[in-house]
Amino acid sequence: MKALRAAAAVVRKPSLLITTLVRPPEPGSLAHKAFTKGARANVWIYRRTGGKVGGKLDGTPLLLLHHVGRKSGVARVMPLVYLPDGDNVVVVASMGGAPKSPAWFHNLTSTPDTLVEIGRERRSVRARIAEPDEKAALWPRLVEQYPPFAAYQQRTERDIPVLVLEPR
């Protein structure tokens, strides 16, 4: 049944096939640098249009997550797929199924109080890792909304973290 739902999603959104099959670029590689520049361009466009352009990935909503480098202290912004969950917002530290969690995840575990932008709205939030039972309830909804998450989890040995961003 899961495979059938994933196949149906790919038929509706062919670009999901690429995001499901292609591994994330290695940090420091030319492809990674291009991805980083693309993310910065997406942030710029998102902000200028209030998320009307650059606010969705294959029909899935994106937010802009602010975080501060735990080593560098540099403020950064990352566009991420998110799932609304009542007053909370849920994000996934998948990094395309890479062996390591993304830097923004480690940054949020060091400095959990942060800001997200959803459209033109800015929200102060506190990040926390979802409890196992909470993740078990959220994961099917996340995969339904963005099917590549299932492939990302199969691609890696690590348990992909799910973060709940709660209003402050």
Language-model features: locations:
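A generic local structural motif
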Residues: 50-51, 77, 150
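Short, structured beta-strand-loop surface elements
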Residues: 8, 12-16, 95-149, 155-159, ...
